[in-house]
């Protein structure tokens, strides 16, 4: 944290704390104080105060008067998020198929190639990273800012659960097949099929994350 640039310090503190809460580094019920975070992160109170305010708006923490209590993501939150993703992510794939450019095609192809490479190596850590990139890229390729602005924060909040899913190789194998089918639909310009496949993918992910089905 000590080498962060001052112009984006509050944003970077927010990203750090948000990620640590979502990943479970800060546990639900844990109390965070400005002094504690100053000591841990090596920054002043001002960016920490701004980050805490934003985290409270995201309902990841709540102010107790003596500090900020971590709320994290509950099972009910996860279910709500996945239900929203189920209804919106198909639209992102639909518009990505409609609006994809040559540059976008190259970027998406690169991500899919990386997924296949890391899958062949059983490299779970890099698979987690490119899984995030695959979904983020579809949002970007949609060209619809409202869709991207809605989905990307929700996907960040489920990152911890999605990354745990990579440890289940059967589910990971199915995810690879689903991603490739979505990719093929997008690059072929079949918007309706891309929407259908992306929606099905989220349905399957929701069943695994919430109900434990592969």
Predicted regions and their residues:
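Short linear motifs at protein or domain termini
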Residues: 1-94, 98, 140, 206, ...
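Anionic, Ser/Thr-rich low-complexity intrinsically disordered regions
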Residues: 10, 172-176, 194, 204, ...
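Short, flexible turn/loop "capping" segments at secondary-structure junctions
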Residues: 30, 62-63, 131, 174-176
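Alpha-helix N-cap/N′ positions at the starts of helices
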Residues: 65, 88, 110, 174-177
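Conserved amphipathic alpha-helical segments that form helical-bundle/coiled-coil interaction surfaces
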Residues: 81, 102-163, 177-185, 193, ...
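Short amphipathic alpha-helical interaction/hinge segments
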Residues: 159-162, 166-169, 206-213
